[in-house]
């Protein structure tokens, strides 16, 4: 399907229940509706984010008792992934509090984390903070 602004607007303006129905129909076409995927969320870098996203407990507006940590090591992430796998998870989602992920040694380390978890026959997804893209 080729995505156009018109097609996106058409979907966006549909009633919520119609969207839910269509999404469930497509989901059932490809997945057993009686099964769920178990995932584990791992905060690979906590605290220190300068953003103020209202939904995020790490946002500057919230004063929580979260102990911040710098970027986890690849081995720490692998340990979390193994624990998750042992408990039945098939996916690890890595989250990091960042303003903008740069193409630097931290990003290279995240790529290594992804590769390492994939080598354990697990799926990986990442939420790496707000990224600013300049075109």
Q: Which residues make up each language-model segment?
A:
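Hydrophobic faces of well-ordered beta-strands that scaffold small-molecule active sites
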Residues: 36-40, 92, 124-126
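Flexible, acidic/Gly-rich N-terminal and inter-domain linker regions that tether
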Residues: 1-55
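Active-site beta-loop-alpha junctions enriched in small/polar residues
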Residues: 41-43, 97-99, 127-131
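Short secondary-structure boundary/capping elements
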Residues: 48, 72-76, 105-109
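Conserved alpha-helical substructure of the radical SAM core
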Residues: 60-96, 112
